[in-house]
Amino acid sequence: MDKKDQITINSNVETLELYSEMYPFTLSLRISNFHSEADYKKFIKSCEMIIRRSAEYKQWRDYIIDVLQINECMITHERMDEVTIEVHHHIPSLFGLVKALVNKHIEENTEFCTFDICTEAIEVHFKNRVGYVTLLKSMHEKFHNGRLSIPIGFVKGDYNYFVRHYSKHLDEADLDTIQSRLAVNEGNCSWSRDDYPAAAKA
């Protein structure tokens, strides 16, 4: 009989681990840390992708745009029946939110898996504890290319809750980014209403 046919696979249903008496290694659903920085970043990006593609995330976005009718660019005031409008995560970015949730688990030594983190991130959205802005697609691209600053007064959602409760799980570079975004207002941003005719008329 082939050795592979003799392998028995068992499971510890309490800890959600697979194991075999023939091998010294186990496979756990959850982890408590990462082997490398590359694995850490790959995990965060994977969670970010799953969240964006989830039905729940789409429902959150559609609720903002279709039900609440927050469907115009906060800068140009162009509406979604004229242009493509996107929801931009401002404080925190979606990557920053996932990073904070992962770091929290690591610091508190509580095990987690991809789906724990994704569920927690979606729940933060449904608790309205993320800061977001609706932007024209080209404005969204402009922001991510470092060509646009967004006044904090335009940001919706309870981003202050995130700052108070989750920012402690981020590193200095992340905190600097948050502080710089909090400091932007209509008086010191990189553009004026006169730059956008539609906005000037609003």
Can you say where each PLM-predicted feature lies in the sequence?
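Hydrophobic transmembrane helical bundles of multi-pass organellar membrane proteins
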Residues: 72, 89-90, 146
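The −1 position to Zn-ligating cysteines in a subset of zinc-ribbon hairpins
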Residues: 72, 86, 135
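Histidine-centered nuclease catalytic patch
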Residues: 78-131
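A boundary/linker detector
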Residues: 1-81, 169-202
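Intrinsically disordered, low-complexity peptide-like regions
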Residues: 3, 8-10, 87, 138, ...
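Short, structured coil/loop segments at alpha-helix boundaries
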Residues: 53-54, 112-115, 136
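A detector for short metal-coordination/catalytic motifs
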Residues: 125-202
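Short coil/turn linker and secondary-structure boundary residues
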Residues: 35, 92, 113, 117, ...
